[in-house]
Every structure is written in C-alpha cells, then in structure tokens.
Design a protein with these regions (language model features):
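Acidic, surface-exposed loops and disordered segments
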Residues: 1-269
C-alpha cells in the first residue's frame, strides 16, 4: 500500500452510504488483501465479509449499506492491540479503494455478529465495520454524532509526544525523522476520540504508552483502548517504513517513570 499518509489524512468514519452494492471486483480485492494482513505481534486476525440480511445483523447508526466486515482473533495478552493493528490495515486499504468504513464496537447487536463470525471457544470478535461507497452527504444523525465526540479535533502534538521522558514535551521542530510517523499517530481514530496514546522518543527509539481514559469500560477480553493503541502502532509503522526508516518492533520496557502503561517500541536498526 503506497501513499499511506494520504489515506490516513483523508479517511473519516462513514456511517452514511449511497445504497450501491460493492462491485464484485472490489469485494474480491478486499477479501484477497485481508488474507495477507500481518501484525508485529504475529497473532493472526481472521476477516469475514457479511451481508446484514443474510446474517440478521443490525447497526442503528449505519444507513445505506448491508455489507459488513468482522474480525476475529484468538484471545491472548496482546490480542486487542494486535487486532487494532491488523483491522486498521484493512480499513486503510478500503480507503485506498474509495470504500468507506466505520469502526463498530458497541453500537450493534454483537451476539449476531459473533454468531456470523463463527467464533471458536477461545476466539473473540473485538470490532466490525460497515463497508460501502460513502454518500455525498452525511445523515443528520451522523453529523450530530461526529459533533458530539469532536471527531475532527485532535490533541496538540506536544500533549501526545515527549522528548526523552514524560517531563519534556516534544515539539514538531525537534521530532526529526519521526515527525511524519508521529503526526500520523496523532491523526489516528480512537474510541470516542479519546486519543489514549502517549509516545516518548529517545535516542534511536520510539516508545508507545497507553494513558487510560477515566470511566472507560473494559472487560478481560475486550479492551477498546488497547485496540486504539494497535491503530496508533499501525499508523506509525506503515508511515515510517514508507519514509524508508529501517525500524524493528520490540516489547522491551525502558522503565520510564510514568503512570501510563507501556505497550511497545520501534527502534532504528
């Protein structure tokens, strides 16, 4: 996938579609690409395209399409963040084709989606997405939802990224080779637009942390803010590599003083 920054910048959640069925060639491309998706945690994610009428699926915030994609993954310690990375790769590929998506976690009849995904005993379906061609105009409901979560707003660069430690905010001017990749992290979507990622840049590495939002519900097997972290890691990794940065993924906690939760790092080779 080339021009990754273009797709990240231009993508938005789409809840209002134009009613056309996806072209068969587009469906085939999506299905084929989904089979190639990998994440740095080496945990496979299975994708399935599903027709709402066939499987009895319902999502009250989506209009104009009957097609959805679900993802499933075997539950493990890193399952949520791995899922977020892989599912965002699918979302960005759909964007590259002009196909709209919207992350769905709670506003759906989850049991029907899970049944359609044919989960095994240790598998979970963290999220799904609608798929379709975006309508030219949003519905009133969609406009109100976006306004309610301030969907087009993002936190300032200096509140998300830090220079060496959490005591020193990182400016764009000092971000150096990491600037583009960090900016694509800043633009990433997140549940209710909470933007829970915090990133510390050291000499030759970038360390990702989760700063949990107060009152944000989670269960043992479903952690939406960990999924958000996977999205952030995906944006960083794809952008850095498109900029020809030779980086490796690792989970090696640098033990920085913080109340945030360490997730993973990327280091220059």
């Amino acid at each position: 996938m080339n021009n990754i920054t273009e797709y990240i910048i231009n993508r938005r959640s789409v809840r209002t579609y134009d009613g056309r069925e996806l072209d068969k060639n587009d469906i085939e491309k999506l299905t084929t690409y989904a089979q190639t998706i990998e994440n740095p945690f080496k945990i496979p994610v299975g994708f399935k395209l599903m027709n709402a009428k066939e499987y009895g699926l319902n999502c009250p915030v989506v209009v104009g399409t009957d097609l959805y994609v679900g993802g499933k993954i075997k539950w493990s310690e890193n399952a949520s963040v791995a899922f977020g990375y892989s599912f965002e790769m699918f979302v960005l590929y759909a964007q590259s084709m002009g196909i709209g998506t919207v992350w769905l976690g709670g506003t759906m009849n989850r049991s029907a989606y899970e049944e359609a995904m044919e989960l095994d005993g240790d598998e979970i379906m963290p999220c799904a997405s609608a798929l379709g061609y975006p309508a030219k105009k949003m519905s009133l409901r969609e406009s109100m939802m976006r306004k309610g979560v301030k969907a087009d707003e993002r936190l300032p660069f200096e509140e998300l990224f830090f220079d060496g430690s959490f005591d020193k905010p990182l400016s764009k001017e000092n971000a150096g080779i990491w600037l583009d990749a960090l900016e694509m992290v800043r633009l990433a979507p997140s549940a209710v637009n909470k933007q829970p990622w915090r990133v510390v840049v050291t000499d030759n590495a970038v360390h990702f942390y989760l700063k949990r939002s107060k009152g944000f519900a989670r269960t043992e097997k479903l952690d939406m803010q960990m999924i958000d972290m996977g999205i952030a890691l995906c944006h960083f990794d794809l952008t850095a590599k498109e900029n020809n940065l030779n980086i490796v993924f690792e989970q090696n906690d640098p033990k920085l003083e913080s109340d945030a939760e360490y997730i993973a790092s990327f280091s220059l080779v």
